[in-house]
Design a protein with these regions (language model features):
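A positively charged, amphipathic N-terminal helix/segment that binds anionic biomolecules
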Residues: 1-116
Length: 116
């Protein structure tokens, strides 16, 4: 996620910053399908002595959504939903980038005493 350096905002007028902020907010679009985290795939061995996984063919891969807070709360993602989850994660990364830039603009507006 790349947020413009504050020096880039110093060159812009307050009106330009406000217009940029409005444009960024409008570009967020539909945020109902946003996920934050990552998608990981794992393979498993069941431990049964006569299973194919003991011969080097593990079960899976199984997809899991891992929230930002770490391994805790991993959610299984059925194979049919993996493309949907990938799209939602991409939308989440896009939204985070936009929100970071909006926040940086708001910091500059606050420094100018023009936030509002």
């Amino acid at each position: 996620m790349v947020v413009p350096h504050k020096s880039q905002f110093l060159k812009l007028s307050t009106e330009d910053l406000l217009a940029r902020r409005r444009g960024l907010a409008a570009s967020l679009g539909d945020v109902e399908q946003v996920l934050l985290g990552s998608l990981v795939e794992q393979v498993r061995r069941c431990g049964k002595t006569d299973c194919r996984c003991t011969a080097g063919q593990p079960h899976g891969p199984y997809a899991y959504l891992t929230p930002r807070r770490g391994r805790r709360g991993m959610r299984y993602v059925p194979a049919a939903l993996v493309p949907v989850v990938e799209n939602c994660l991409a939308a989440g990364r896009h939204a985070e980038t936009i929100l970071s830039e909006i926040s940086a603009i708001n910091v500059e507006l606050l420094a100018r005493r023009e936030l509002g």
